[in-house]
Design a protein with these regions (language model features):
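A preference for well-ordered globular domain cores
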Residues: 1-89
Length: 89
């Protein structure tokens, strides 16, 4: 069983992989503005040990899944919109 820090780091690593993602994700990140929560998570994931968000993130365990779901939902929606646009052209 993972301790709290390991669990949160594993969520962060999985989310960071999503954010690094494939070419589509990179294009989506450039084209669409992400919500505030997602930007906070992105900032926290870039430098988790140095981030002012990481301590707060660790202290609110229930926030982890919410943030992960938010990131996943925003990227899924942005990718859908991007794919729709390229199909329309």
């Amino acid at each position: 069983m993972l301790d709290k820090r390991e669990y949160i780091q594993s969520v962060a690593n999985g989310t960071l992989e999503l954010l690094r993602g494939d070419k589509i994700s990179k294009l989506v990140r450039k084209k669409y503005t992400l919500g505030a929560e997602t930007r906070i998570v992105c900032n926290m994931l870039r430098e988790p040990s140095n981030s002012k968000y990481f301590t707060e993130f660790i202290e609110h365990e229930e926030y982890v899944d919410t943030c992960k779901a938010q990131v996943n939902a925003e990227f899924a929606e942005a990718e859908r919109r991007y794919r729709d646009e390229i199909q329309d052209t």
